[in-house]
C-alpha cells in the first residue's frame, strides 16, 4: 500500500451547492463531472464528496435511507460510476462520505426496528424504556438541540439519536450491523472509490450504562464526554481496518469530535492500524466562549496566539506518529476570511495569508469549494437560512430559553453558521452566479459578481492562482511533506511564523494575520522567496496587512 495521501491536496465538494446541470436549483454529479477540468487546473489530487446517497434530506444527506443508491436529486448510480472513471482518467482520486453513526429513520433497517420489540432489526438501534415518570432514559442532549431520545408510541420505548430525531444511532455492538457496513464499504470500493471521510466516527461506540451528565441548574440536557470516545471505539475501527480498509490502497480521514492529541495518536499511529488522519476541532473553537449555555454561538474575538498554540501542539505531538488533516473551512464551518480575517478591503491578501499558513503545515491540506476564490460568508436574514442546526438552535436559545436575543443570535449565525459555507458556488458574474438556470436551493451570495471563478481565472494574481502555486510547491518540495515543524515568535499577536526542516531543505513560512503593518526581519540572501502575496514581498523589513511569504533554503 502506498501513502499517496501524504503528498495529496484534497478538495471538498458539497454537491448540492457545487454546479447544477438540470436546472432544478440543486447541484448534481454531472455538475461535478463538468468541472473536473477546472479542478485539474487548480492542481488538486483528490476530491472528497459530501453524501450523495438516497436520503430524505433532513440533514442535507447525512440522514441516509439507502447506502448503495445515489439520490435521484444528484443523479444515478451510473452517473457515479462515470464520475469515478472521468476523475481517474485525469489522475484525480475520489473519497466518499461514510455516515455510519446513524441512518435515516426511513432506512429499511429502522422501519423494521420500530415495528416491535422482538423484530430481528430491533437491536440494530438503541431502544430504552422511559424513566418511571415517562421522561427519556437519561439527560443526553442532541447536537441539534433538545433530548437525544425520541419516544416512539408503537412500542412505548425511546430510541437514541445524537443528531436529529430522523437520524437514529446505529448499534455498533451488534455484529450484524458492522457486517452490513463493511459489505457496503466494499461495494463502493470495488467500484473504484479511493477512500472515506468518516462522519462523526468518534461517536460509534456508546457508553452502554448510559450515565447521566452532571448539569448546572436550569440546563436540561448535556453534550460532552459521553457523546464520543466510547470504550470499544478503537476496537471497532481496527476491525474495520482489518476487514475492509487494509485490502485497498485508500485514504481515510475521521471526523473525531472531542479528540485531543492523545486520542488522535490512537486513531492515526501507524502501528495501530486504524485511520490515516483525523479532523480535530480544537482550532475551530478559538472564537467560541467556553462554558456558555449558548455553545458554539457564544462568540469571542479571534486570538491568533491561541490559534498558534493549538496548531503547534498538534504539529509537535503528531510529528513522529500519526498525521494531521489540515483545514480552516468545510461544509460545517464558515468562510475563514469573514470569520477570522477581513472580507472587504484585504479580502484577497487575507485569503492568501490563511492559505499560506495552512498549506505550509505538515499534514494533508483540505480546500473547501469556493475557498480557492476567497468566497465570503452569506448575508442572509434569519428566515433565509436552511440549516437544521440553525433552525433548532434559534428555537432553543432564543424562543424557548431566552439565552440570546434574536439580534445576538443572528450576529453569531452570520459569523459561524454552517450555511455560510453552503451558498452556491460562484462560477461567473451571470444570474445566480452561473450555478443554476433555476431557483437555487439556498440564496446565492450577493457578492458573486465581484467574487467568481471566471473572474479569478482572468486575473494572474488571483487567489485561485495563488492556491495553484501553493499546490505546485507541495508537490515539488519534499520538505512540505516530511519537514519538522518549529514555531517562532509564539507570543506575537499578529505574526504567525514557523519553519519546516528536513535533512536537505528548510522552509520559513510567515504571515501577518492582521490589518496592522508590523516589522518583520527578512531572512538573509541565502534564502529564496518561493511565494508571496504582495507583488514586492520580501523587499522590506515591514509586513503589510495580511502579507505572507514562503522562503526556501537548500542546506
Swiss-Prot record:
Active site (record annotation): 199 (nucleophile), 255 (proton donor)
Disulfide bonding pattern of the chain: none
Reactions this protein catalyses: Hydrolysis of (1->6)-alpha-D-glucosidic linkages in some oligosaccharides produced from starch and glycogen by alpha-amylase, and in isomaltose
Annotated site, Transition state stabilizer, chain positions: 332
Keyword Cytoplasm: yes
Stored SUPFAM superfamilies: (Trans)glycosidases, Glycosyl hydrolase domain
E.C. designation(s): 3.2.1.10
Cited CDD domains: AmyAc_SI_OligoGlu_DGase
Keywords: Cytoplasm, Glycosidase, Hydrolase
GO MF entries: alpha-amylase activity; oligo-1,6-glucosidase activity
Similarity comment text for this entry: Belongs to the glycosyl hydrolase 13 family.
Protein name: Oligo-1,6-glucosidase
UniProt organism field: Heyndrickxia coagulans (Weizmannia coagulans)
